[in-house]
């Protein structure tokens, strides 16, 4: 609960609504994230640009399309996004792959828990 309270107090907590009903929530936090300082068995695809992190994403059961909506919102604000998930979370891992995130390696949370780390960087070309 303290992480969620901190997200709210810091202005990093977001709710996605459909027809006036909250259907999803997530935290969108400007980096650097201390747990992303060290990555194992891989490397970040882009490690020089500022980045944001998506954390604590959840949606109501039976809700569809919210991940895409969350990503659109986040990429409008930052073109370099990192996210992590549990090894066992095959639904999230498949969604990350579907929406263009690349697996980068393993990170460890402050409590030592392992997470699989992903990144997507969208660099717009000046040649239009």
Q: What name fits each language-model region?
A:
Residues 1-13:
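Active-site rim helix/loop that mediates acceptor-substrate recognition in acyltransferases
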Residues 11-28:
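Conserved beta-hairpin
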Residues 27-62:
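Conserved acyl-donor/pantetheine-binding loop and adjacent beta-alpha core of acyl/acetyltransferases
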Residues 53, 76-88:
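Conserved GNAT acetyl-CoA-binding A-motif
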Residues 54, 92, 115-117:
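Charge-biased, low-complexity intrinsically disordered regions
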Residues 59-76, 93-98:
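Conserved acetyl-CoA-binding loop-helix of GNAT-fold acetyltransferases
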Residues 88-105, 113:
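Conserved active-site alpha-helix within GNAT-family acetyltransferase domains
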Residues 109-128:
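C-terminal "cap" of GNAT-fold acetyltransferases
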């Amino acid at each position: 609960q303290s992480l969620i309270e901190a997200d709210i107090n810091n202005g990093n907590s977001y709710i996605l609504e459909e027809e006036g009903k909250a259907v999803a929530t997530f935290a969108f936090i400007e980096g650097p994230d201390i747990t992303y300082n060290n990555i194992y068995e891989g490397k970040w695809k882009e490690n020089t640009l500022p980045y944001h992190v998506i954390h604590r994403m959840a949606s109501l059961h039976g809700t569809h399309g919210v991940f895409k909506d969350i990503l659109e919102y986040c990429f409008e604000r930052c073109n370099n996004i990192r996210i992590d998930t549990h090894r066992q979370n095959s639904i999230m891992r498949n969604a990350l792959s579907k929406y263009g995130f690349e697996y980068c390696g393993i990170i460890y949370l402050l409590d030592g828990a392992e997470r699989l780390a992903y990144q997507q960087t969208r660099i717009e070309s000046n040649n239009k």
